Amino acid sequence: HLTKTETGIVFSSISLFAIIFQPVFGLMSDKLGLRKHLLWTITVLLILFAPFFIFVFSPLLQMNIIAGSLVGGIYLGIVFSSGSGAVEAYIERVSRANRFEYGKVRVAGCVGWALCASITGVLFSIDPNITFWIASGFALVLGLLLWLSRPESSNSAQVIEALGANRQAFSLRTAAELLRMPRFWGFIVYVVGVASVYDVFDQQFANFFKSFFASPQRGTEVFGFVTTGGELLNALIMFCAPAIVNRIGAKNALLTAGMIMSVRILGSSFASSAVEVVILKMLHMFEIPFLLVGTFKYISSAFNPRLSATLFLIGFNLSKQLSGVVLSAWVGRMYDTVGFHQAYLILGCITLSFTLLSFVTLRGGNRLLPTAETQSPA
């Protein structure tokens, strides 16, 4: 068993290697377009999930926490922290090419997460290794689906691409130009001060949740069932989220997500019963649809869509991981010294402050407006 500080070290290592790989994955994703080379790499690594966790990661953590953190950080940084973002960006790219909403496709991910949460909550109490082997098995199914899929651009998108309309050649220089855009840094302020702090809060929330039950095993089971119910609700909201975000605007969607995150963290600092932490856990399911859909729509409306993967993996995921390297270890130490409640009060005040600041730093009003970068030339 790891202490809260050691757990924070592991999460910091994952964040560190995500910092290294996410820029690479973002640039590769925008360069590859609809080609599946990167997805195949991620899928193969997912198939090795069980052997890695059982025969490599777990023994290393028991022998040496630093060595285990480094090896685990490399694998998890590639497959999950960077890989999941690359997959999200690929799905969003396919949705734009074929004129359907990303949020409606993401519903399947919510349902899958709900089923996994309920199953793993029980299986972890029996034998965690069962869960790892199931993950490798589903990765094989993913490989089959990836082989069968044939993503293509819509006919109109293909004609536009062939004529060269709206084309801006992808290059490292083009991506680097983002660093000179004030609106890019305004987006970073939101990601680091709100989304990143919230992610660090959520990393060890399961441990806080389990402390309200008679035994950790019972807490794990209840946490799994609550997550299942919440993710099913998440799926419903995610299906409706594109229409809601189109109406209120991407900026307001991100601000709404920030307020929900702040309420959940601050509420957790005052929670005193199992019922209260269950309700607070359910708030997560309202926040995720607004954050994900709002982020992609904000990127596509405020920046060049050809750099969507780079913006998502660097501007969103990488920024969260970069700040997470520092925050995870610091917050883990706070949990050990002042306890969950006091730490949550501090984190909640931080997210609320940055959410209010984002009213100024984020670009856009109530409606999504095209930019000069995304409009075709007259």
Question: Which residues does each PLM region occupy?
Answer:
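Helix-to-loop junctions at the C-terminal end of transmembrane segments
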Residues: 20-34, 124, 236-250, 335-336
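A membrane-interface helix-boundary motif in multi-pass transporters
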Residues: 35, 122-139, 333-353
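Juxtamembrane intracellular "pre-TM" segments in multi-pass secondary transporters
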Residues: 150-188, 214-215, 378
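Short amphipathic helix-loop junctions that connect adjacent transmembrane helices
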Residues: 1-7, 201-222
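A late C-terminal transmembrane helix in Major Facilitator Superfamily
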Residues: 306-337
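Structural signature of the two symmetry-related core transmembrane helices
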Residues: 37-52, 252-267
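Central cavity-lining transmembrane alpha-helices of secondary-active solute carriers
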Residues: 9-27, 225-240
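Cytoplasmic helix-loop-helix junction between adjacent transmembrane helices
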Residues: 72-109
